[in-house]
């Protein structure tokens, strides 16, 4: 019995197989295209990796109390220097083995947020944010931007990322640090505070001396240590006294306005009273971003329009309020880390063993690493640096070939039927 080609099982199977093959070829034709400023983001990630390695070595060389591993959870700030071991080991709370994660009973803190910012790729994310905020790369500008920065010891990783991004983009940061921190941050005030880390990096020529914090405060409630116990405040003051740095503190002043005034005074004195191009906040310091839930739930680049809308009915005084409303300076808010990173950087948990840092490597990323940046689905490194697209010169021919095969069989079958109908053969009916 007569059957046109399009009704034959063999023809249908061959067409289906051909189309599936074309689909597979198209799917596997993906190419990696470098995202804008690829080189800068790679450079920033490598700077951060280098700084992490320096601090890791420094941490391992710091003597530790024999019982401190067990006692650390009771009090991270008290050290018996008469009873020490020669080397420190890495805490189970520090799965990346950075030496920058510390714990003290009674302090709040989200370990995932702190660990996630210790990924060197976080510096590449900060480069993206700064460029989004209007900071141009050195090759595209006529003057060096000035950036006001507020650091917190809660996020040593984010602090390193900001410094690495500033170095990459050749930006001059004016930094003020709140030395108190939350759990899983840089809260070993006696031996390895953020100021100690900062000094080590500058002494090691990782960052220029101009990147040193221009002033420091205790932080916490009203930026003056409210809510901290006396031993912790004593440890913080001791850590500050080891360094030649302006200390924003007055025992007679407990009002927030005083500490905000002093911060703004420092920022502008250190910049010859010139305006800033950007304000970058790290952490949840009250003097920096106030107590507004809207700001605390708004990570990333905050445009002037966005800040104007937030502060329209909100006069919560803080550095961010003054920069945006009085100086017309936009901001980057590095807070609520899980919301900030979205899918660009993996969230690292205490129990997660998938993400690792190869401390033996000379660089975190090589410029010519290309598709290897997708080496781990969990790492998701490629998302920040590369964009995967289907190869136009493969996909279109495959599509046209599939259409051509189907149309050819259809047209051929049409003429088969037409010839059969005009032949007047009974078997054709």
Model-derived features: positions:
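C-terminal functional extensions of proteins
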Residues: 278, 285-429
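Structural motif
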Residues: 148-150, 278-282
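Short, compositionally biased "basic patch" segments
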Residues: 20, 24-120, 124, 416-419
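Membrane-embedded segments
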Residues: 121-124, 130-192
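Solvent-exposed loop/turn segments at secondary-structure junctions
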Residues: 153-157, 180-184, 223, 285-288, ...
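Short, Lys/Arg-rich N-terminal segment immediately upstream of the first membrane anchor
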Residues: 1-8, 386-388
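Hydrophobic membrane-insertion alpha-helices, especially the h-region
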Residues: 10-27, 401-406
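A substrate-binding/cap region within the structured catalytic cores of diverse enzymes
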Residues: 190-279
């Amino acid at each position: 019995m007569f059957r046109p080609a399009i009704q034959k099982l063999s023809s249908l199977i061959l067409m289906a197989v051909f189309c599936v093959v074309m689909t597979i070829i198209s799917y596997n034709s993906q190419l990696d295209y470098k995202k804008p400023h690829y080189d800068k983001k790679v450079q920033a990630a490598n700077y951060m990796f280098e700084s992490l390695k320096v601090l890791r070595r420094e941490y391992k060389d710091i003597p530790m109390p024999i019982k401190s591993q067990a006692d650390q959870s009771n009090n991270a700030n008290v050290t018996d220097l008469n009873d020490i071991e020669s080397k420190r080991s890495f805490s189970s709370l520090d799965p990346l083995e950075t030496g920058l994660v510390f714990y003290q009973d009674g302090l709040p803190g989200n370990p995932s947020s702190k660990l996630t910012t210790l990924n060197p790729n976080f510096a590449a994310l900060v480069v993206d944010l700064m460029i989004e905020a209007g900071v141009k790369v050195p090759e595209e500008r006529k003057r060096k931007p000035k950036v006001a920065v507020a650091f917190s010891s809660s996020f040593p990783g984010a602090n390193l990322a900001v410094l690495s991004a500033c170095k990459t983009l050749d930006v001059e940061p004016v930094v003020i640090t709140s030395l108190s921190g939350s759990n899983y941050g840089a809260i070993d005030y006696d031996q390895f505070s953020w100021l100690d880390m900062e000094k080590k990096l500058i002494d090691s020529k990782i960052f220029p001396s101009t990147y040193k914090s221009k002033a420091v405060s205790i932080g916490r409630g009203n930026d003056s240590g409210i809510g901290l116990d006396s031993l912790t405040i004593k440890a913080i003051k001791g850590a500050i006294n080891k360094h030649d740095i302006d200390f924003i503190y007055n025992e007679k002043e407990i009002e927030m306005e005083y500490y905000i005034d002093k911060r703004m005074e420092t920022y502008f004195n250190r910049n010859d009273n010139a305006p800033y191009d950007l304000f970058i906040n790290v952490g949840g310091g009250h003097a920096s971003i106030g107590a507004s839930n809207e700001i605390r739930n708004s990570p990333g680049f905050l445009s002037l329009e966005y800040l104007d809308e937030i502060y329209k009915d909100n006069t919560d005084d803080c550095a961010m309020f003054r920069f945006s409303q009085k100086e017309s300076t936009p901001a980057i808010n590095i807070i609520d880390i899980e919301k900030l990173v979205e899918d660009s950087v993996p969230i690292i948990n205490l129990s997660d063993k998938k993400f690792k840092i190869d401390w033996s490597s000379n660089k975190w990323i090589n410029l010519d690493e290309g598709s290897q940046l997708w080496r781990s689905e969990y790492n998701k490194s490629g998302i920040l640096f590369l964009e995967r697209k289907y190869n136009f010169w493969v996909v279109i021919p495959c599509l046209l070939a599939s259409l051509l095969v189907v149309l050819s069989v259809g047209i051929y079958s049409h003429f088969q039927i037409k010839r059969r109908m005009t032949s007047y053969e009974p078997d054709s009916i």
